[in-house]
Amino acid sequence: MQAHPLRGSLFEKLVVLEMLKARINAGLAANLHFYRDSSGLEVDVLLEAGNMIRLFEIKSSQTINQESFIQLNKVAAIFGERVVKKVVLYAGQEQQKRSNASVLSYLYAGEAATNEVTPGSAHETD
């Protein structure tokens, strides 16, 4: 499956379904959106909660590099201060706090989608 041409797409769907399942089971609105603008700029999941937005990029690789953050940061620039959290969910096991986003294992996708983000909380982007 590592080299299968549909690996990335299937992995992304698995992660989004886990996020959706966690939100529904927690009694939260299932407000997960895919974002793409007219120029092709996209992010895998945009989660709106009131006026706040969390952005998620999903990667099927087991390592993260700087390219993993490019789309995330460009979309965050469009929404400005409304973005309170940027997360890369990937197939690896390590959790990291980078200067521009959090990096979480896909195993935490449900938790990342259900933790409510409020200004000043531990989940707010620095």
Residue ranges of model-derived segments:
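A cross-kingdom feature that marks ATP-driven nucleic-acid transaction machinery
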Residues: 1-126
